[in-house]
Design a protein with these regions (language model features):
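Active-site region of glycoside hydrolase catalytic domains
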Residues: 1-340
């Protein structure tokens, strides 16, 4: 219905936004609907965190494949659009220089992002997942695999932060995020030797590590034959401060620093050959942030929730000027090329 009704006006279609987050939080930790998990993973009334995430993910992958197949066979030729999927993409650094921790990075990436992208683009689950999970991974039929190969036109990358990955396959780990077999036996941690991987933000899961942006783009470029990419989400959050003055809430210097460093990292990846075609800041406005509700603010524009008044933050003015300056530079380069 969407292709038929809006295809003449929509150039880019995304079948899912962050399906890895939806599956992990809905069927492993249970903090998202339908809130299914084992007691060792969360507080749920029912569920199996060791099997259900993989069944749910498998169905997401197949439904993505069906949507892409429909679009390509019935609409793409006449409408001229592109179709892809948007993934939440974390970068990981090895906790140490050991081979075990370097392999833990590969498992962390495979059990979080490649879990979906490998079947959709390469037609099979990652080797790291097959080795650890075996028959717990659902199987694709021959028809599924044929449909899945090159099953998108672009990859949407939602990237905010990075972590360390520590081996739990050959070492003993405390039972935290990533350490279990169903998560890839790769402990996800933000600190090493008492230091965070990057400057902590007020939002407890964002650490400022712009190197991770360049590295995740380069990794995706190399693994998936430089499939076109869009940075579909990237941004910096502050905690809600109800007693602060309005002027202080608009002076978001740390957001400006974050955006500048991450945009520079994207530019570096592009100069090295990555086919990145667009960038979307999260977010234009303060908004309802899923399970965090109105307790976190990501907007370039401040929203007074009582009156709904919008006010430009420092970051909005900076980003407007950044785009204007980059546009002028590009126009200058094109003019020089025309003269030559």
């Amino acid at each position: 219905m969407c292709f038929r009704s809006f295809g003449d006006r929509v150039n880019y279609w995304a079948t899912f936004n962050e399906p890895n987050v939806a599956v992990i939080r809905g069927y492993r930790s249970g903090i998202y609907p339908p809130s299914r998990c084992c007691p060792s993973f969360g507080n749920c009334t029912a569920g199996d965190s060791t099997t259900e995430p993989f069944i749910a993910a498998h169905n997401v992958i197949l439904s993505h494949s069906s949507a892409v197949h429909l679009y390509r066979t019935k609409y793409q030729k006449t409408q001229g659009g592109s179709i892809g999927i948007v993934m939440n993409c974390l970068w990981y650094e090895p906790f140490s220089n050991s081979l075990e921790d370097k392999l833990a990075v590969e498992r962390a990436l495979s059990f979080y992002m490649n879990w979906f992208l490998d079947p959709i683009i390469l037609g099979k689950y990652p080797a790291e997942m097959k080795e650890i999970l075996g028959d717990h991974l659902p199987a694709f039929s021959k028809d599924d695999m044929e449909k899945l190969k090159n099953g998108l036109d672009f990859i949407g990358i939602n990237h905010y932060t990075s972590f360390y990955a520590k081996d739990c396959k050959f070492s003993t780990c405390e039972p935290k995020a990533g350490a279990s077999k169903t998560e890839g036996l790769s402990l996800r941690i933000a600190q090493k030797d008492g230091l965070f991987i990057g400057e902590p933000s007020e939002v407890d899961w964002i650490y400022v590590y712009p190197q991770g942006m360049e590295k995740i783009i380069t990794y995706i470029k190399d693994r998936y034959n430089n499939t076109p990419m869009f940075i579909t989400e990237n941004g910096y959050g502050y905690k809600e401060k109800p007693n602060f003055k309005r002027e202080d809430l608009l002076n978001d210097v740390k957001r400006v620093d974050y955006m500048r460093s991450y945009l520079d990292a994207i530019a570096t990846a592009v100069r090295k050959g990555a086919d990145v075609r667009g960038y979307f800041a999260w977010s234009l406005l303060d908004n309802f942030e899923w399970i965090s509700g109105y307790t976190e603010r990501f907007g370039l524009y401040h929203v007074d929730y009582a009156t709904l008044k919008r006010s430009a933050r420092l970051s909005a003015d900076w980003y407007r000027q950044f785009i204007a300056n980059e546009t002028k530079q590009c126009q200058s380069v094109f003019k020089e090329a025309d003269v030559k």
